[in-house]
Amino acid sequence: MSQVTDMRSNSQGLSLTDSVYERLLSERIIFLGSEVNDEIANRLCAQILLLAAEDASKDISLYINSPGGSISAGMAIYDTMVLAPCDIATYAMGMAASMGEFLLAAGTKGKRYALPHARILMPQPLGGVTGSAADIAIQAEQFAVIKKEMFRLNAEFPGQPIERIEADSDRDRWFTAAEALEYGFVDHIITRAHVNGEAQ
């Protein structure tokens, strides 16, 4: 029995919820079902790395129902997704807002999905800064760098001109699943799933 299998089979002390997530992990399914923070990012990054090490030829499915959260934590997840040699299919369910939208769109092109009633939010960039004048200047400079990179990537994911992303991000913008498909954040709207796990 492999070390990975051993790690998964030791379910003593797990709650019912933990056991469900462990079972899903064995099917290469992981969940982002909360606000994005460092703890959640560390867990998701570890799961992606584990599954990629187990089999680099099989897809990982990332289901997203998240209001967003920390940019740095989200970028850690994104960088790990890029680092992984396997394709990562992303699925919007419920709400994929802010960093949730970013990670949804960052999935492997052709394998980004939305459930019919999912809602996707492309947010207005926020950059509140506090502290001394010197601290504010440093924070403002860093925010400008991050904002520019987020615009670049959020334009690259759907294949939109960066000018359109900048204009559309001037205010929070919500998308239905159909609108997200038209915009390019997702490639398919799921109507049902086959027994073998393939979405349709």
Please give the residue ranges for each predicted region.
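Terminal-region recognition feature
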Residues: 1-200
